[in-house]
């Protein structure tokens, strides 16, 4: 089911329809090693990120046919205009699939897995001044929507570094979730706000990790970023984020973080 023009900034929950059908066909093709079926559903820019951080492009996926996790789990689909977010969760394993609407139909742009730890880990220290990513990053967005999404993201990073819950709340969508390898469960917007308030009360700070590199994709009402980040002396990881243009500002929809082992 497609998003009506005036409603594209709001998520459309789809129990079935073209996105879910395309998603089911992709899983079917992967299970049967059907190269033609899978190739027809993968975007030229497609990326597959496995739970230990191994990244494969479209050509390699069509050679190796990796097995998707949680393939039989019920999916949650949210459509945002020309993009759709598919989630399949079971226990500590979480799967994200991003679909984009192309002229020929829906195509898969990203498949990513996060296997969360049984007990949450304490992240290593970041740079206290938060130069990267709060003020400058080693990546230059090319178009206006990308620039606006990056500005919003840096606003979130600054809010986290300074424990500013009000700014954080404005720039985060209500349906936001953060799914990280080093945590035992996903966190909601309210969870994150509670964490910020607790840090503020204790006088502690959480410095965001520096950005190493990024790829961005503009879909009109949404922007996707697949970033590589790394704390000093820590392991790198892929962090995928998506923003939606809603209520006159770009809000983050999710953060999906896979550590590179």
Give names to the regions the model predicted.
Residues 1-11:
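Bacterial N-terminal signal peptides
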Residues 26, 37-38, 46, 61, ...:
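Hydrophobic pocket/interface hotspot
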Residues 48-49, 86-87, 108-110, 178-179, ...:
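Short hydrophobic/aromatic-rich beta-strand segments that constitute the beta-sheet cores
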């Amino acid at each position: 089911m497609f998003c009506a023009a005036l409603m594209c900034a709001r998520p459309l929950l789809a129990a079935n329809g073209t996105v879910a059908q395309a998603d089911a066909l992709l899983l079917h093709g992967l299970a049967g090693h059907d190269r033609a079926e899978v190739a027809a559903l993968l975007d030229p820019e497609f990326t597959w990120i496995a739970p230990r951080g191994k990244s494969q492009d479209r050509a390699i996926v069509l050679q190796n046919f990796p097995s998707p996790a949680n393939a039989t789990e019920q999916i949650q689909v949210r459509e945002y205009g020309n993009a759709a977010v598919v989630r399949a969760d079971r226990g500590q394993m979480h799967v994200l699939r991003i679909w984009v609407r192309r002229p020929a139909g829906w195509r898969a742009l990203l498949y990513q897995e996060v296997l969360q730890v049984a007990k949450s880990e304490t992240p290593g220290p970041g740079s206290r001044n938060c130069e990267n990513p709060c003020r400058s990053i080693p990546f230059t967005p090319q178009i206006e929507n990308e620039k606006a999404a990056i500005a919003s993201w840096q606003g979130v990073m600054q809010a986290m570094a300074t424990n500013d819950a009000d700014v954080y709340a404005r720039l985060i969508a209500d349906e936001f979730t953060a799914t990280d390898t080093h945590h035992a469960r996903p966190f909601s917007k309210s969870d994150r706000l509670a964490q910020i308030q607790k840090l503020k009360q204790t006088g502690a700070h959480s410095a965001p990790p520096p950005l190493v590199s990024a790829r961005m994709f503009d879909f009109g009402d949404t922007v996707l970023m697949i970033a590589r980040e790394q704390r000093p002396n820590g392991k790198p990881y892929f962090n995928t984020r998506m923003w939606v243009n809603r209520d006159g500002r770009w809000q983050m929809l999710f953060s999906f973080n896979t550590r590179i082992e």
